[in-house]
């Protein structure tokens, strides 16, 4: 059984993640973005790979109702801004991984919000992991230059 993923945010980071996930045979089942010119476009074509038949949606409820193991969130960094998105994903019984820097060690920066997210995740039997994107520049320095 392959891992099923929803992409939340279709900027540069999640377009890169889309390419990497597809290279590894991961099944992307949905894509969410804010209203704008990307809505309705195919995630694969927008990410520079083959057509995936995954239209980008501005309807999180609809996309989060799909069967998926994890939502990869790459929208913005600040936990107070991201809290409603994380909460929505967790309440949809989806595991969450985010590159938001303030989520990489949120216990120190935003203890109250972190406790609340932790409690929500536990209540729904899912997890939330903040990785941060701090290593991105170093890891890809050779490519970027």
Where are these regions (language model features)?
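Glycine-rich adenosine-cofactor-binding loop
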Residues: 4-17
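NAD(P)-binding Rossmann-fold cofactor-contacting core
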Residues: 23-49
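Short acidic-hydrophobic, aromatic-tinged amphipathic segments that line or gate anion-handling sites
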Residues: 55-59
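Rossmann-fold NAD(P) dinucleotide-binding segment
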Residues: 60-70, 79-101
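Short glycine-/small-residue-rich Rossmann-like dinucleotide-binding loops
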Residues: 75-76
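Rossmann-fold NAD(P)-binding glycine/threonine-rich loop
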Residues: 81, 87, 92, 101-125
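General beta-strand structural signal in soluble alpha/beta enzymes
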Residues: 98-99, 128-132
């Amino acid at each position: 059984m392959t891992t099923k993923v929803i992409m939340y945010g279709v900027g540069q980071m999640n377009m890169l993640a889309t390419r990497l996930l597809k290279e590894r045979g991961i099944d992307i089942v949905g894509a969410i973005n804010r209203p704008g010119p990307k809505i309705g476009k195919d995630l694969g074509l927008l990410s520079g790979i083959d057509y995936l038949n995954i239209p980008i949606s501005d309807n999180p409820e609809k996309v989060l109702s799909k069967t998926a193991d994890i939502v990869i969130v790459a929208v913005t960094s600040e936990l107070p801004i991201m809290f409603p998105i994380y909460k929505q994903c967790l309440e949809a019984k989806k595991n969450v991984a985010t590159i938001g820097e303030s989520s990489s060690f949120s216990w120190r920066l935003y203890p109250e919000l972190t406790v609340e997210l932790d409690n929500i995740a536990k209540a729904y039997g899912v997890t939330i992991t903040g990785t941060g994107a701090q290593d991105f520049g170093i890891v890809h320095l050779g490519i970027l230059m």
